[in-house]
Amino acid sequence: MIGVLVLAPSAVLAQSLGRQIDRVRDGTVRFTYASRPGLCGDGRETIRTGPAIIVLPNMFGYGTSNMDVCFAGPVRVAIGRSNGETVSHRVHVGGRWSTDDDATDLGVVSAPDAARYLLDAAARSNARNSVYALAAAVFADSIDLVPDLARMARNEELRQELRQRAVFWIGTYEDETSTRMLHALASDTHLDDEIRGSAIIALGRDDMSEADVAWLRSLYPNVSEKLRDNVFLAVSRSESPKASRWLTSVVADDHETEHTREQAMFWLGQGRAPTNDLVRLYDQLSEISLRRHYTFVLSQRRDREALDKLIDVAQHDADREVRHQALFWIGQSKDPRALTFIRDLVTR
């Protein structure tokens, strides 16, 4: 009996794209394809998708950007070839190719086919090139790569950085499928803390629901101290009052370790809780070490309410060292009221 291997059409076409690239022994091969919805770029290294901001090859995170323009595609990939081997991958979103080079241009190709080819290339490439190839794959339109990315995240034969990048990209899909996959990765005790932590952080999206917060809270008692820090980070991104109240309760819980309480306080301050929640927290801190840490956390807010409380701590805390810490952070403020307060102290 002769066995016949039947490949899915997308796999066959991806191989076809690979053969076209392999025909170029030396030089640059480039091609273009449609970008997934919600993705845009500046035509160079900066890309935005939803709340995620990426500056290739090293910056991956969430927040706002000051991009002057953001083009909704297409995705442009350039592959460097030398002696019949691929030596580089580069990807841009938006913009257009230079007409001055002698690159082999394959034109517009199928986005799913390009994604399959590039996903395979990411697993085979070195550190820098794998980052570009994986990004180029997930930028593609008309293909769901969440299952593939999850397999990559679980594959211990791949480099740790690539596995963590795969988890990050799962989080950018922002749908029920990706959320379920992140839950599965975060709760899988067979995975190392780096992968689980990446999944927890990826759940801390701008649109995270109260159900997401509740799920993270249920995970919290069963994870390591390192992963608890990741839970605090993720929960802090929620605007729900329940998230703020929970972080506050952890800070006030004297059954928790000092490190855990300090981390919960830090992320309460870094997150979206109103400053008034931080101000009220002070009265629950009996430990001097926590009150010292509190002055730093409060100093990061840089609003009127936070400065008022810092001044109050500097004047009235029972511990001299805590008062000095508060004074130090007041001295770092550029608020004119801080300068006035320091000047008044000196001239008394």
Predicted segments, located by residue:
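Alpha-helical adaptor scaffolds
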Residues: E262-Q270, N276-D283, E287-I288, R292-T295
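Alpha-helix N-cap/helix-start positions at coil->helix boundaries
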Residues: A127-R128, L158-E161, L191-E194, E225-K226, ...
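Boundary at the C-terminal end of the N-terminal hydrophobic targeting segment
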Residues: V12-A14
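Alpha-solenoid HEAT/ARM repeat scaffold
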Residues: R128-V131, Q164-R165, G197, D229, ...
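N-terminal accessory interaction module
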Residues: S16-L119
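Core register positions within helices of long alpha-helical scaffolds
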Residues: A136, W169, A202, A234-R237, ...
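Amphipathic alpha-helical scaffolding segments comprising HEAT/armadillo-like alpha-solenoid repeats
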Residues: A111-A123, S142-R154, D175-S187, G197, ...
